[in-house]
Structure formats: C-alpha cells, structure tokens
C-alpha cells in the first residue's frame, strides 16, 4: 500500500491532496490554536467528513490522504500509545467507508517509545491490518533542550523498519517555540517556526547520513520543505567546515531525494524555484486543509 501513491494507482486520479488533516471530535482545536497563534477558519470547525468532501469537490481533488499532526511532545505512556491507536483506527474507518476518496498516513506514538518497541508495533499494525499509505512524523520529538531530531541514532530501528517496507513518510515541522519569542501576534509559530523546523529535520537526515543509510524510505516534506530549497545549498557549502563527511555534491543529491508538497507554498516564484531543484515527479500537491482554506488556496489549486 505505501508505494501506490507514487506509482500505478496514482494515475487513476486527477488530483491527490497529500496534506489533508482530520480533527477528531475530542480534539480541543481552538485551544491548541491559541497556544501557537493560529486561527483555523471558523467554517472548518468542528471538522467533519462532509466539510472535507465539500472542499475536495471545490478543488477538484479526487483523493485526500488524511493525517494528524504527529505526537511530538509528551511522555512514553499507555495513554500516548492509546491515542495513536485510536486515531489510526478512526482514520482507517473513514478510508474503509470511502475507499475512492481517502487514504491515510498513520500516527505513531511518541517516537522515543523505541525501547518498548511500541512504535514498531504500531507501524506493523497500521500497514498490515489498517493498510495505511504511510506514516506521519514530526521534525523532532520532545521539548526544549531535550528535543531530538529524527535523524538521531536512537530512531534507527524505526527507520530500518520503514526502509524495509519501502514506506512513505510524511514529515511535518513541529510547532515548537524557538529560543526567542515570535516577533508579532500575526507571525505565530506556524509562520516563523514550522518551515524552519522542517528544514532542520531534513538537513539533519542528510548530514547524519540517515538519508543514505535508509534510501528506500520515501520522505515527503510538508509545505514545499519550508526553507529547505533555499538553504540546502548553504548546508552543502558550509557543513564540511563543521565536520560533515559528505561532499557538497552528495549533500545536494540527498536533498533532491525528498518529495516536496505544495501546501501553503504554491506561489509561482516558489514553484519555479522547486522545479529547478528537483525532478517534477518529486513535487506533490497538498492543501493543509482544514487548517487553512482560503480563496488563495483554491486559486492555486487550479493552477497546479
């Protein structure tokens, strides 16, 4: 199931929305929005399947891949594992009821839950029993000085399992504060931090050699990779001076193995830049619905 998004089955659809969230009814979305300085469009809350289907029809989207922002903070606990399982079974039930309109990326438990192999169990369950199209992961796990980016060796067993399955991974930047506050209420974490967190995670995968160690994992970077297309060359030029053993050419080659989706990034200069950077089949369509849906979103949906 995990590879069909990039192969034969994708040809059956006019447009696939690779970045489409679902919000369970027990999620206090308004509260979590307030924590990061974001306002989900009021008409999209409380979220329902009909709201997504209506938006998909408006944008000529045939298939949406549902995902829930990864569990990037918290503790290794039964509650955390239960939350991941419940969300995955909820998403799978939607796909079962509407197989021609939805697929889903599975949510993993807090990724540090490696020692108890809970994340590995959830990977097996969601692929083998729920038929997930891939998994959704965060750029880092934990908070503050103990936050760990996803290329860390502690996560190697997870990457090894995903590599063995030739899995699709949807990588979304964490909504975590930087060491300085965001500069203005109109420039909250989704604007100032998430794009850079995506870049930091992608760059971490590259310079640690993780991307080369697990080459069969197909990684999609949310929001056109955030700042990745514009900073990849900076990594290539400077990281050797800080101990990276890869050549600049190898670094750029590894950045080009990622897939880049267009949510909140489908501005013509951005698209022109990414088309110069990666092959066209590595550029995917995404909307970030229902977190956002504006006239601009719909406008660019018809231009891609």
Tell me the role of every PLM-derived stretch.
Residues 53, 186-206, 214, 218-304:
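H/E-rich (His + Asp/Glu) clusters that bind or coordinate divalent metals
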Residues 20-22, 173-178, 290-291:
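Short glycine-enriched loops at secondary-structure junctions
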Residues 19, 56, 91, 126, ...:
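Conserved, mostly hydrophobic/aromatic
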Residues 2-65:
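An N-terminally biased module of ancient metal coordination in phosphate/nucleic-acid-related enzymes
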Residues 47-56, 115-126, 268-273:
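Short, acidic/polar
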Residues 55-62, 93-102, 165, 209-217, ...:
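A structural motif corresponding to the C-terminal end of an alpha-helix
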Residues 16-20, 64-66, 103-106, 135-137, ...:
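Hydrophobic faces of well-ordered beta-strands that scaffold small-molecule active sites
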Residues 62, 68-201:
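Active-site gating/metal-coordination segments in enzymes
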